[in-house]
Amino acid sequence: MKIYQIDTSARKEGSTSRALAKKLLDKIKKPEDEVVYRDLNDEMIFISNLTESGMKIPEGEQTEQHKKMFELSDKLVLELKESDIIIISVPIYNFGPPATLKAWADLAARVKETFKYNEDGSRVGLLHDKQVYLVITSGGTKINSKEDFLTPWLKHVLNFFGIKNIKIIAADQMALDYEKSIKEAEEQINKIS
């Protein structure tokens, strides 16, 4: 099995989402499994007019800048396609996703790679048979509350890619009771078989 772990917290040290994702990885990883790790903060991932316009230009007419942007997009798409299990650790920042995760989703959303258009214009995801674990943390936002815009958005993006098997491990409202939130998240991890 290939496990794809994506960390999104801007905090390299002292990140609760990263620490919980590591515990989850240690719990589910078998000795023969391969782990592909991506820290979205290691590269400045962003979407620009160059990226968007480049998606509409035939490959032979793209500039070197277009090609460089697509190298990263191609790599992200391949990592998704080749994975069996995906772990995404993500804190809620101001009710939504970190900017790097939004950019990752934009770069991974590629026609004929992660989704396609049907003749009637509807879209269908192309990535199936994948298990996703979302390790979500927050200071004050309750997961799945009306002020949580991260969780429904991220589930929608993954469904758009064709990924339906999604489990959430939540350590939310840590500012209210940090120890309780961590304990509950660790219990969720321990229940995974």
Residue ranges and their predicted role:
Residues 68-152:
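Helix-loop-strand module that forms the ligand-binding subsite of alpha/beta enzymes
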Residues 1-90, 95-103, 188-193:
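N-terminal beta1-alpha1-beta2 submodule of the flavodoxin-like/Rossmannoid cofactor-binding fold
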Residues 38, 135, 169:
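Hydrophobic residues at beta-strand termini and immediately following loops
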Residues 144-193:
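Glycine-rich phosphate/pyrophosphate-binding loop and the adjoining helix
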Residues 29-31, 127-130, 161:
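A short, structured loop/turn motif at beta-sheet edges
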Residues 46, 122-123, 165:
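Glycine-rich, flexible loop/turn motifs
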Residues 10-12, 139-142, 173-176:
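Short histidine/acidic/glycine/proline-rich micro-motifs that form metal-
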Residues 2, 34, 130-132, 164-165:
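Residues at the starts of beta-strands that form the adenosine-phosphate
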